[in-house]
Amino acid sequence: MNIILAKSAGFCFGVKRAVETVYKEAEKNQTPIYTFGPIIHNEEVVADLEKKGVQVIHSTDELKGRPKGTVIIRSHGVERKIYDEIKALGFEIVDATCPFVLKIHRLVEQYSREGYHIIIIGNETHPEVEGIKGWSDPAETSVIGTCEEAEKFTLSSEKKVCIVSQTTFNYNKFQELVEIVNEKGYDIIVLNTICNATEERQTEAERIAKEVDAMIVIGGRASSNTQKLFEICKNECENTYYIQTIKDLDLTRLKSTDNVGITAGASTPNNIIEEVQKNVRNEF
């Protein structure tokens, strides 16, 4: 059996930086460590951090009455008001937001201040998108994630529009949705804020999926970028399997397979990728 491992598989820069930040803080700090939401969308990493005493919170209300310590902002970023609320409660802040996401916050804040209506191309319930929304005027912010939503979008003709994207959104889908909005004739500025690593990962996954008999996509179930990888690979290779760890993979399905491709989301640690690759190789 021939195994093709995507070079781009595994931790991206932003995720690696965020995870390393939490581990360093956990090692050096004598006070409680909290992360605002799971630091990344990977259950194994979050569980390991919990063993080291790192607690996950999902709102500033959860900090009330808790021992003072450090709150680490997750890689996906948060709304502007969250920073103020954490400080007001007397907690220290360590910001592990991905620099590419921080750039979107700055852009959205700037264009919102200049009177633009902000369109975020992405999944409305994704924490990164929820965070981005918190840096612009809520009354002048829309989230579009489907063609149907793009078709239904309407705005007064004199309004200027600034379009940004969730960093992990499907690049081809982004272009499609932008085109639909653009056809409405608004004065639009488009800022492609999809991370380069996301584009490269998706392009490589698509190429490999076209060449193999089976494709394995590794990542957390809540990971948006892994879900996008699965969709892209499944479109090119019917035998595509979405797993979190080797335990989720039925190796018997690969018995008559000559070529297997492996890729992984940006929140998947190398040890999990290596374990999958090793088990597939040893089995056949």
Describe the residue ranges of each PLM region.
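The feature marks the mature, well-folded catalytic cores of soluble enzymes
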Residues: 1-284
